[in-house]
A protein has these predicted regions:
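His/Asp/Glu-enriched short active-site or ligand-binding loop at hydrolase and phosphoryl-transfer sites
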Residues: 149-190, 224-230
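Conserved nucleotide-state-sensing and coupling region of NTP-binding domains
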Residues: 220
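Structural detector of well-ordered beta-strand residues that form the stable sheet scaffold
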Residues: 42, 69-71, 95, 144, ...
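Domain-start "cap" segments at the beginnings of catalytic or binding domains
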Residues: 120, 126-167
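Active-site beta->alpha N-cap acidic-glycine motif
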Residues: 12-107, 111, 117-118, 122-129, ...
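Helix-enriched interaction subdomains in cytosolic or periplasmic regions
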Residues: 1-14
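Short histidine/acidic/glycine/proline-rich micro-motifs that form metal-
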Residues: 47, 72-77, 100-103, 149, ...
């Protein structure tokens, strides 16, 4: 593998600790290990829900009794609320990925926060939690910024209402220039107990997602891992 490609895979697949220091208060790994002592992996899926891809993901997770967290775009939740409810009914969690998949580097602070709040209202309606209720937009609500992009001021504001979840392993399934085999290889070479893995339940990622996810589940389950929601 050429040096530039190797560095790209190393930096993107597992973010360097410098990023942890630059974004204090974000969660980059999972909160705990199983009481049984079995290692845990936290699977997360960004950008859904959408027809075909998200139901397929739910089917794959069910085969392994795996729980996961879906960071959903509000507009997609409006289009496919039944898919999100199916995820909740199966014991998965739904987190906030903004309403319009906004980049924090290209959106004003107030507009970005309003966009996140709009998505959270929809999530609350799915959960049966009403705005203004004791659990509405609580500190236990989950948020992941699209593209992993944040500013310090936005991070400060978001942490008042959310756990801001980043990741420790990025599968890069969204990248059409990568082969499914390379995504799988880099992911399995990097993963370790407590990691938060990012997949994308999107049309763009479909070919790589459908190759990588079942193989990751099979490989890690064979090593005794459990799969938990955040």
């Amino acid at each position: 593998m050429p040096m530039r490609a190797w560095l790209d895979a190393a930096l993107l697949t597992r973010p360097p600790r410098l990023l942890h220091a630059l974004l204090p208060g974000c969660e980059w790994t999972g909160p705990c290990h199983a009481l049984s002592g079995a290692p845990i992996i936290y699977l997360t899926f960004d950008d859904g829900p959408i027809p075909d891809e998200t139901p397929w993901v739910l089917e794959q997770l069910a085969l392994f009794e795996a729980k996961a967290t879906f960071f959903c775009v509000g507009q997609n939740l409006e289009r496919c609320p039944d898919i999100a409810r199916a995820a909740l009914a199966a014991g998965h969690r739904v987190g906030n990925h903004t309403h319009q998949h906004r980049s924090a580097w290209a959106t004003g602070r107030a507009s970005y926060l309003d966009d996140a709040a709009e998505c959270q209202v929809i999530i609350g309606e799915l959960d049966g939690v009403k705005p203004g209720g004791s659990d509405y937009q609580s500190p236990r609500s989950l948020f992941r910024p699209p593209y992993g992009r944040l500013t310090w001021s936005l991070l400060r504001d978001l942490r008042a209402d959310y756990r801001v979840i980043m990741w420790s392993v990025l599968t890069r399934d969204y990248n059409p220039s990568l082969s499914p085999e390379s995504c799988l290889r880099d992911t399995l070479a990097t993963v370790r107990p407590g990691d938060v893995l990012v997949f994308h339940d999107s049309q763009k990622a479909s070919a790589r997602l459908r190759f990588v996810l079942p193989r990751v589940l099979t490989h890690l389950a064979g090593q005794g891992y459990q799969f938990s929601a955040l």
